[in-house]
Amino acid sequence: MAVEISETLTFECETGNYHTFCPISCVAWLYQKIEDSFFLVVGTKTCGYFSQNSLGVMIFAEPRYAMAELEEGDIPAQLNDYGESKRLCIQIIKNRNPSVIIWIGTCTTEIIKMDLEGIAPKLEAEIGVPIVVARANGLDYAFTQGEDTVLAAVTHRCPERKSSVGGQNQPVQDEELQEFFSFLPPNDENVKKTVVGSQKNPPLVLFGSLPSAVAHQPSSELKRQSIQISGWIPTERYNNLPSLGDEVYVCGVNPFLSRTATSLMRRRKCQLIGAPFPIGPDGTRAWIEKICSVFGIEAQGLEKREKKVWDSLENYLDQVRGKSVFFMGDNPLEISLARFLIRCGMTVYEIGIPYMDKRYQAAELYFLQNTCRDMRIPMPRIVEKPDNYNQLQRMYELQPDLVFTGMAHANPLQARGINTRWSIEFTFAQIHGFTNAKEILKLIIRPLKDNNDFKNFDWTNLVRKDNNSLN
């Protein structure tokens, strides 16, 4: 197929065919991140089966999450929701003594209009333990939206930061982001001088759930640039949530946290730093440089550090350079991963993505476009809510070396001779920062190596045997 080189990114939107994990799967990693929390999923038996089986934790292991199973009487509101919720929460406090209880509302609670938001404040005042309500249900486009919803709810519980002396706010120095968020305050000429002249940078809060070992890396990288981090959302301890206010700068580490970003700006009046996400050495460098530029600090040593990482990846790059990939769309990590793979010398035919907030990912999209120009390759087509049937026809035509897909499509595609890699693996793998770039490449190289082995099974031919041959 002849591919025309496009000078700009092409965006399309199809009918959408969603085969993804339920967003309540966010409980799997958030209950481990917020160590003093307890997650209560309010849903049906199906939600319970999913929570127990797909999350890989048996009931006798006593994890810090549980199911509140809805009954038939809950549908016509014949049962007392408040009384039953109170009984469950008192039992949770008695057995686990959490600092916070997080209610996860499912599809069913949305359909029957269960008033979790109305029950929670009254019950919280009675039992004396904070109750956070998050609607992480299967009506969303991608399972990663579960974390986004929970973090957006947690931001409302962060303490209010007192204004500095004089009460003057420090508007954001991000002109690109201002174009997308018209409700942000206008730029102030004196801010840069104020920031540069101060010995300590303004409060900076990072949001996004990363393992502790991975979260330490961006913190230490910013510390090298003399930038102190005021806190993370979420924190390992609920009572250690950072203070928020109009003088606080916030920056995300994952591309699927647009609700959290909007909540931080509109509700808590924080100043959002729009930067590419720290995935891959190129993204990590751009992320740090953008934060430094907002604070009026000249980044030091990042070019040499990035080059050192690329040099250490040379053996991996030799195995992927010249290969082609196709993203079917399973979580909003696709844009960042595609940008990194293009920088590695790969060709990306199509980036399918379940949904995309162009405002929140503006810096990443701009970075992707510049990366394609620098590498002198065609701009990939970005398809939001892709139709899987149409994608399959395009895959047959393009013949990519590797397809990133959800778990529902992996085996059927493999049986038709299309090499696949589960998209969900990148959600749980350590892919952020300079040192974890090789983990991304390892995930890609493995299926490329296994491709020849699968062909030996003759999966490319669907053979129909005659019934008489069994006799």
Swiss-Prot record:
PANTHER family reported for this sequence: LIGHT-INDEPENDENT PROTOCHLOROPHYLLIDE REDUCTASE SUBUNIT N
Q: Highest taxon of the source?
A: Eukaryota
InterPro entries per record: LIPOR_BchN/ChlN, Nase/OxRdtase_comp1, Protochl_reductN
Q: Which family does it belong to?
A: Belongs to the BchN/ChlN family.
What keywords are assigned to this protein? 4Fe-4S, ATP-binding, Chlorophyll biosynthesis, Chloroplast, Iron, Iron-sulfur, Metal-binding, Nucleotide-binding, Oxidoreductase, Photosynthesis, Plastid
Please name the GO terms of the biological process aspect recorded for this protein, alphabetically: light-independent chlorophyll biosynthetic process; photosynthesis, dark reaction
Q: Does the keyword Isomerase apply?
A: no
E.C. designation(s): 1.3.7.7
Q: What is this protein called?
A: Light-independent protochlorophyllide reductase subunit N
* Record's subcellular location: Plastid, Chloroplast
**Could you give the cofactor binding note from the entry?**
Binds 1 [4Fe-4S] cluster per heterodimer. The cluster is bound at the heterodimer interface by residues from both subunits.
Signal peptide range equals none
Which organism was this protein described from? Huperzia lucidula (Shining clubmoss)
